[in-house]
């Protein structure tokens, strides 16, 4: 019984710290199709891999922008993603495609979406 309590407590603390770190990240304002969004900035491999996984709500941002150092085809998925996302594929600040990525709860399985052409930025907007 004590092991279960310790594991549960550890998991709770880990998720709390993770949530705190995500909500305290750098943000930028980014305009897409005449609307300005406040976006969390991700510019490292670890952040690219996590994205908005395990996030159920963002208090200080509309979504996330992934800044990549190169232009190549991108693939995103909804593993452990609990919010619906509008995905914008961007090449040199021009939107080159858009996809919808449902939450894992709605899709009942992992869904993959791919950029139609190489992209050096990807924006995920939480779709309420």
Each predicted region: which residue ranges?
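N-terminal hydrophobic targeting signals that begin at the initiator methionine
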Residues: 1-3
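Hydrophobic membrane-insertion alpha-helices, especially the h-region
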Residues: 5-19
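Compact, glycine-rich, soluble single-domain proteins
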Residues: 17-128
């Amino acid at each position: 019984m004590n092991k279960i309590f310790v594991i549960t407590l550890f998991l709770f603390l880990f998720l709390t710290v993770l949530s705190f770190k995500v909500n305290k990240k750098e943000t930028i304002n980014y305009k897409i199709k005449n609307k300005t969004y406040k976006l969390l900035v991700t510019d490292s491999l670890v952040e690219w891999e996590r994205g908005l996984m395990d996030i159920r709500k963002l208090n200080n941002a509309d979504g996330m922008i992934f800044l990549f150092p190169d232009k190549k085809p991108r693939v995103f998925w909804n593993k452990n993603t609990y919010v619906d996302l509008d995905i914008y594929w961007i090449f040199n600040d021009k939107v080159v495609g858009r996809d919808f990525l449902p939450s894992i709860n709605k899709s009942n399985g992992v869904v993959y979406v791919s950029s139609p052409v190489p992209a050096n930025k990807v924006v995920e907007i939480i779709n309420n």
